[in-house]
Every structure is written in structure tokens, then in C-alpha cells.
Amino acid sequence: MSSFPKLVVHTKKIEHNARVMVDLCAKNGVTVSGVIKGASGLLPVCNAFRKGGVSSLSSSRMPQLRAIKEIWPDQETLLLRIPMMCELDEVIRYADVSLESDVETLKALDARCLALGRTHRVILMVDLGDLREGFFEDDDLYAAAKLVEDAKGLVLEGIGTNLGCYGSIEPDAKNLGRLCSQAEHIESMIGRKLAVVSGGSTTSIPLLLDGTMPKGVNQLRVGTEVLMLDEEKDHHFEVPGIYGDAFTLEAQLIEKRRKATFPIGTLSVDAFGNKPHYVDRGRRIRGLIAVGRQDVGDMTQLHPQDERIKVYGGSSDHTILDLEDCADDYAIGDIVSFTMDYENLMHSSLSPYVAKEFVDD
């Protein structure tokens, strides 16, 4: 008997989506590093990325990169988060390349490389205004580039940036053009071409679609688009040929009853300390499914495949649905299916309380 809630992973669709993105990028002279952290590094997902033709697999989590190297030793891996001092040895062993933005970390990484008799490739990160990681001043970036170029255990692979993850800044020809100019300056300093100018993540895809991507950018770190999700809708672009249902969530109906839609009594805060906004729609048929915030994060980002269903909200273990327009089609024990956003996929792929089913269709 099946167990629910369940994350259904359609590996062929992920492989197809990866191939679509790889082909789109290749037409613009850009390679794709497949970001697998959004699906918690699930190995069948990693393999689908590989089959789809990505040039490397990338994650911010060292255990995910270690698992990849243990199964596919020759697979190139990229560490997305600036490494902690406590994980430098693992970085050298399991990440072929890492993103870096701190001089002290670079010095320590170089020392560990020499102690282990290894070399390690680094991409220096530049903060172009999103205000997360990266060198903020040009002079600091250039000094770090010289440090790496002179280091015995490190190889300066290139420079990169991140846009849209914290500061909501959109990549555009201006800020990515600045990245390319910084790369050219470093190349003139060190007397050779950089292998990589990494122009961000999924949020940079619109520049490929409208032809405004600066020519110097030759790598993107792409995950959510390959993983299908509705991220493209959030960022107001669409990639033709991408499957939107490569991941689906299935949950079982545990209650169906006509109830009021506005809470009765004195309003306070919910279980998470928030003050939700409620709309009085009168009495309607509501359903409870056995999945909640602990399993999927913000359940209001779930998209019912039956468009007659609406998601009201929920709590840590329950999600509340409006079934008024389809009540006759659902009974206790029936399964309700959803596509998801990035947050939902992160939570459900990681949760031990969500079963995983891999479908090769």
C-alpha cells in the first residue's frame, strides 16, 4: 500500500528539462552547472541532470557533493556556498571547484591543499548589489585574484556573481557587463584568460531569451528551471519546452466538511506567531489533507492540479483546501495532487515524513 504524503519525481522529465536548458545556453556560448540542492541532492535527480548534459553538478551542501563523488568519481562538482573553515579538507576532496569570497579562507584553503598534496580551483565571487556573498570593492577583488594566482595550491578558475537570492536584484546587461569588465581587468593582470565568468543562476535566463546576455558570461548555475517548478512564472519569463510537472506532491484527504471560512472568536496569532489575513466567504466545503508546513514549507505555494481546488493555508501538519466547486469528486482517503514552488520542493525532498517515488516515464 502506498504511503502519503508522497513526492513523485519524474526523472525523464527532469532529464528533458535539463537538455532544454543546456541547449538554450549552448546557443549563447554558456555552459550549465546543474544545481541539485533544491531537490536535496536526491541521487536519481542528480543522474537525470547528468543525462541532460550539464557540465557539472553544484550544491551548497558538502554531504550532497560527497555522495555524488562516491558514486560518480569523475563527475565535476561545484561548491556554491563559501566554505566554512571546518570543512576545507572535504572541499578539497569532494568539490572540484568552489565559490570563494574571503581572503582568510583562501589562505587556509591553500595551506590545506599543500598539506594534502592537492590543488583546488576557485571562482571568486563579486557582489554586484544583491548584498549576499562577494567582494564589494574592485580593489579587494583584484587583490584576491592576485593572491590566488600566486598561491601554490589554488587555481584561479574565474569570477562569478549571485543576483536575486537575497536582495531581489535582477540581472541585466549593466550589472553582468560590469562582471565581464572585472574579468577582463583580471585577465590583463595575470596575463591569461579566465576559464569561467559565472553570470548567476536561474534569474539570469531572461537575458538569454531576449539576447541581452553580455558575451563574456560563459556559465550559469541553474537548478529550479531544470527542476521544472513555477519559478519562471514568479520571474515573469517562460522557457519553451519545459515540463511544469517533473515533481508532484500527493497528499491524502483526511476530513471533508462544510464550515465557516472566518475563524470564530478573538483573533490572536497562529502557531508560528503570525497574524494571517482571513476572508469571510461564508460556509463552504473544506478539506484537510495530511501534509503541512513541516513537510512542504509554505503550503500556499502549492498548486493543485485540479484547478477547482484552492489552498486556504494550514499549520505544521495540515493543509486546508476549498473543495466547494468539486466536493462530489473527492471522498475521505482520496489523493490530491500538486505541483510546487522552490520552497515546497526543498522541504518535501528533504523531509523523512514525505515518501519518495521515482518514475522513469
Model-assigned labels for residue ranges:
Residues 14, 37, 68, 124, ...:
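Conserved, mostly hydrophobic/aromatic
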Residues 1-9:
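Generic N-terminal amphipathic, Lys/Arg-enriched alpha-helix
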Residues 17-20, 27, 38-51, 64, ...:
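N-terminal capping/small domains of soluble enzymes
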Residues 30-184, 189:
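Active-site-proximal beta-alpha core segment in soluble small-molecule metabolic enzymes
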